[in-house]
Amino acid sequence: MSLWKRISSHVDCEQRMAAYYEEKGMLELRLCLAPWIEDRIMSEQITPNTTDQLERVALKFNEDLQQKLLSTRTASDQALKFRVVELCALIQRISAVELYTHLRSGLQKELQLVTEKSVAATAGQSMPLNPYNMNNTPMVTGYMVDPSDLLAVSNSCNPPVVQGIGPIHNVQNTGIASPALGMVTPKVELYEVQHQIMQSLNEFGNCANALKLLAQNYSYMLNSTSSPNAEAAYRSLIDEKAAIVLTMRRSFMYYESLHEMVIHELKNWRHQQAQAGNGAPFNEGSLDDIQRCFEMLESFIAHMLAAVKELMRVRLVTEEPELTHLLEQVQNAQKNLVCSAFIVDKQPPQVMKTNTRFAASVRWLIGSQLGIHNNPPTVECIIMSEIQSQRFVTRNTQMDNSSLSGQSSGEIQNASSTMEYQQNNHVFSASFRNMQLKKIKRAEKKGTESVMDEKFALFFYTTTTVNDFQIRVWTLSLPVVVIVHGNQEPQSWATITWDNAFAEIVRDPFMITDRVTWAQLSVALNIKFGSCTGRSLTIDNLDFLYEKLQREERSEYITWNQFCKEPMPDRSFTFWEWFFAIMKLTKDHMLGMWKAGCIMGFINKTKAQTDLLRSVYGIGTFLLRFSDSELGGVTIAYVNENGLVTMLAPWTARDFQVLNLADRIRDLDVLCWLHPSDRNASPVKRDVAFGEFYSKRQEPEPLVLDPVTGYVKSTLHVHVCRNGENGSTSGTPHHAQESMQLGNGDFGMADFDTITNFENF
């Protein structure tokens, strides 16, 4: 059955591909010459890797296509003749390269769709929990590669060809898993990829069997004496070999498509890893499933490489450039597979302080394949600037140890580690447990750039030998910002948070957009705050943040400058500095109360006043909101005895180091009912809401002088200044250190740190 017929058997696939071909007006062409197009493109002897090659292949295809169309004009079907004329006109209008690439890409899409549909029929089947147990793989065709051979270690660099292809025979699928392993429903996407790889391997089995027969016939021909049928036998062998080459090319095309799918899954995993740097959920365990795909692909390409080498030993003609080219393609594919499987699985800290220890690890997703683990290489690490990383990646710099030493932008201690293979989980990795950045070289800054905007990356690299040729592999970490002092941390996290949230999956290091929609930014802020504090932001919270960012200007987009560079109106700090300080205050001093919903937090003063005045409980109703004017401050708004709203001066982390927030609230008898952060809930009594957070206070002790120091013990309590009882309708007051006379027993909330209340005197 042709590929298009298989597509047509699924209405959704047919509609999808019809729309794809109709984009260029090629649907009629695809329908009219379906089998010919499939055979012609899939049997290409040269896969175009350069622009010149692509143009030559496309022109040849265009020429053959026109000849094929002209040959159909002799048909008696008048409608067909008319369609041929139209198709010939189409070919004249579209460039040869555009025509060829669109059809070739279409075939790759069709291959993926057909395989996905075949997987859907078996997707409900259970698979063993152990990702390395292949005994229950559904049988797709009459032939299957021996499971033990599929994932076996290729310890020899030059295995015997027949063994390299692997024993291929009928396998009964019992569908019964080992009881000790348990049964689970696998992740469908990765299972589909694994299923497609297995299916392609099974189909390649037919090619392997044909190759064995060809080798036997070739050996018989060489050993036999002259025979009158020798010429016919020779021609037959040539035809058999050509058919095998065609099958191999098709298999290689399948392999390329499958490799692309696995790389896509790995890129998604890396993207999720970056999102996890902001606190997003991340299933690190899915990397084991991706490794399984890499190992299966390595087995696939190893079988193919062995088969090509065996086929080249059947020398029927002097020169076979197409077979030589196929060998080069397969060897390069194996090399690319090995290189792409080298990743950073445990990222270093993305805000990295000099002279501070940190850890990271890299992993090679080929496991025990190729036998590299028997002689594990040593992985080295250097730090690169953004510019150096771009040059290395975009120019595809040839890597050697001598040139890399000059690429480093700093000095890292303990920057080498030998890879280790863990037999129990098939992980082949190198752990850097005690690295330390001693020095950093910075680039010259331009304009408003600061050291906190400058991105670096750790560059991990090693060298190994595979099948007698040397392979150098490398990988980059996520971007890091290097600081030398703690006060550089907030802006550094702005750089990292923006990059993790909005980086494209594929990009040059470390290019990033300078503006995003509010919808995008709100998700990033919510993830960041929620992961740090244990409770997500509400819709009202996010609306308030939107007002803060947009100010008077209403736009769909939020720029990088608005986010962390430009001070907010009438303030000396940026939005990010304000947001980060609140996040830190909440995490360090109010975490339990925030999680319990006791703190409304992100609400403007006007709305706070309105909500409190509308409360049915009236006097004594209060809420906690984050200060607009104070970095890392929280303030209390409450309804006073006159029915007006009073705003207390904000408290900061420095205040909570003396007395925690819950105890401060307990001291204020003017606070009775907590206004709920949930608009659908009712106010809660103060002691019910905050009681679990109160600290245990000791009973007053008799007035006793310490015989050594001569001092009397004292306790601290919070009171509200009398001048605050009339309510405040102005903006939240700035933090002010005011003196007071001890005689009246009252003091301002903002002056708490400078005053001691001696209760026992």
Curated annotation (Swiss-Prot):
Positions of post-translational Phosphotyrosine modification: 711
GO cellular component, one term: cytoplasm
Molecular-function annotations in GO: cytokine receptor binding; DNA binding; DNA-binding transcription activator activity, RNA polymerase II-specific; DNA-binding transcription factor activity, RNA polymerase II-specific; histone binding; RNA polymerase II cis-regulatory region sequence-specific DNA binding
Record's keyword terms, sorted: Activator, Cytoplasm, Developmental protein, DNA-binding, Nucleus, Phosphoprotein, SH2 domain, Transcription, Transcription regulation
Xref: InterPro entries: p53-like_TF_DNA-bd_sf, SH2, SH2_dom_sf, STAT, STAT_linker, STAT_N_sf, STAT_TF_alpha, STAT_TF_coiled-coil
Modification after translation, per record: Tyrosine phosphorylated by hopscotch. Phosphorylation is required for DNA-binding activity and dimerization.
Stored SMART domains: STAT_int
Presence of the UniProt keyword DNA-binding in the record: yes
Disrupted-gene phenotype: Exibits aberrant expression of the pair rule gene even-skipped at the cellular blastoderm stage, leading to larval segmentation defects.
Protein family (similarity comment): Belongs to the transcription factor STAT family.
Function: Might play a role in signal transduction and activation of transcription. Plays an important role in the segmental pattern formation in the early embryo by activating specific stripes of pair rule gene expression in early development as part of the Janus kinase-STAT pathway. Might play a role in male germline stem cell maintenance.
PANTHER family for this protein: SIGNAL TRANSDUCER AND ACTIVATOR OF TRANSCRIPTION
Protein name from the UniProt record: Signal transducer and transcription activator
Source organism of this protein record: Drosophila melanogaster (Fruit fly)
The gene coding this protein: Stat92E
